């Protein structure tokens, strides 16, 4: 079975930062990293939404925005509106390309906002059926669904630097084993 690493932890602990650091190191070693990263969008120190970026093309989309701040259609989600069309325009194709083209698939994040898209759910399922290594950030409310499918690494402020080294080591060993 291919390596599956699921990173979880409280908001703001550095899950996306850790995954980006691992992806940069893997890329630096000449491996192809594909998939998607989600980042907060802030204005005046206040979070106003989330942006998704395809790792292979750099294409960006708006995952979610505060209600009343975007012209994009979407599904109400607490104080946000989730833009399902943007998930399906940017994240889903990036994930599917990664299954074919990448050495390591990154999905940040698998969570309730992303799961408003049935196509996103299907794309995650396709990754899990593939033989490609996966590094994914999983929302704490979803982690129990993924726990049986791979390694779960719960980040804290105290362990995040050590976890970076552990996860990078696991990923590199897997990739070197695949390439021989």
Curated annotation (Swiss-Prot):
| Top-level taxon of origin | Archaea
Family annotation (SUPFAM superfamilies): P-loop containing nucleoside triphosphate hydrolases (SSF52540)
Q: Which keywords does the record carry? A: ATP-binding, Hydrolase, Nucleotide-binding
EC number(s) stated in the UniProt entry for this protein? 3.6.1.15
Catalytic function, reaction form: a ribonucleoside 5'-triphosphate + H2O = a ribonucleoside 5'-diphosphate + phosphate + H(+)
Q: Which Gene3D superfamilies match?
A: P-loop containing nucleotide triphosphate hydrolases
- List the transmembrane segments: none
List GO molecular-function terms, semicolon-separated.
ATP binding; ATP hydrolysis activity
Q: Which residues bind ATP?
A: 9-16, 104-111
- The family this protein is said to belong to: Belongs to the THEP1 NTPase family.
Q: What does this protein do?
A: Has nucleotide phosphatase activity towards ATP, GTP, CTP, TTP and UTP. May hydrolyze nucleoside diphosphates with lower efficiency.
What protein is this chain from?
Nucleoside-triphosphatase THEP1
Q: Which organism encodes this protein?
A: Thermococcus kodakarensis (strain ATCC BAA-918 / JCM 12380 / KOD1)
Upper taxonomic classification of the species? Answer: Archaea, Methanobacteriati, Methanobacteriota, Thermococci, Thermococcales
